[in-house]
Design a protein with these regions (language model features):
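Short hydrophobic alpha-helical segments enriched in small aliphatic residues
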Residues: 13-18
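Nucleotide and nucleotide-moiety/phosphate-recognizing core
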Residues: 22, 28, 32-136, 146, ...
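Short glycine-enriched, charge-decorated loop/helix-capping segments at active-site entrances
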Residues: 132-138, 177-181
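Hydrophobic alpha-helical segments within soluble ligand-binding/sensing domains
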Residues: 141-144
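A charged, well-structured terminal subsegment
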Residues: 170-172, 179-192
Length: 192
């Protein structure tokens, strides 16, 4: 099995993980379509903020593999072919807290099984640049994940959580997650 990308010191490195079959080049063609959903907020004021790490990760993946995003129903969408697989990459335009509608629409439209999705999201509970991959699990207080879980009626879908740390004063969580990366953090999360 190929490995899942992991974030480390400003680049993607590879880390084996049994949950996802996305990078397994030996899978049957029938299972070769995947939906990657990066969570974030639309608008220039939110670009490259901690809360938009899902958008940034997808941007890097799509650019690296020669794709481009186009505005479509409920999202910016790109289709990337890589290692014999099709990746539908989705950046919802519904704002973070309403991401479930776009997720469900595109999963149904593209006929992608829930197990062949991956939601990429920021996580305050993880140190900056650390990642966690789970096949299922709670929303951990993340409003984008809450909406997806409510829309799908389950929390049993794969999530890739990128740590953004929690270095903020009491009552400053919103400013922190919607804030731009500090210079020292930027070095850790610079996606290439």
């Amino acid at each position: 099995m190929k490995s899942l990308p992991e974030f480390r010191e400003g680049i993607f490195v590879f880390h084996p993980h049994p949950i996802l079959r996305i990078f397994d080049t030996e899978r049957e063609t029938a299972m070769s379509k995947f939906l990657l959903v990066g969570l974030g907020n639309v608008g220039a004021e939110y670009a490259h903020t901690r809360h938009n790490i899902g958008f940034d990760v997808l941007d890097a993946f799509v650019i690296k593999h020669g794709g481009f995003f186009k505005l479509d129903r409920l999202a910016e969408v790109a289709e990337v072919k890589w290692k014999g697989k099709t990746f539908i990459c989705l950046k919802p335009t519904t704002f973070m807290n309403l991401s479930g509608k776009a997720f469900k629409y595109w999963m149904d439209k593209e006929k992608v099984d829930l197990e062949n999705t991956l939601t990429i999201v920021d996580d305050l509970a993880l140190p900056t640049s650390k990642i966690r991959l789970r096949a299922s699990g709670s929303d951990a207080g993340h409003n984008g994940l809450k909406d997806i879980q409510l829309t799908l009626g389950t929390d049993a879908y794969p999530k890739l959580r990128f740590g953004i740390g929690n270095d903020f004063a009491k009552g400053q969580q919103i400013d922190f997650v919607l804030g731009k990366w500090a210079q020292d953090e930027r070095k850790l999360i610079d996606i290439k």
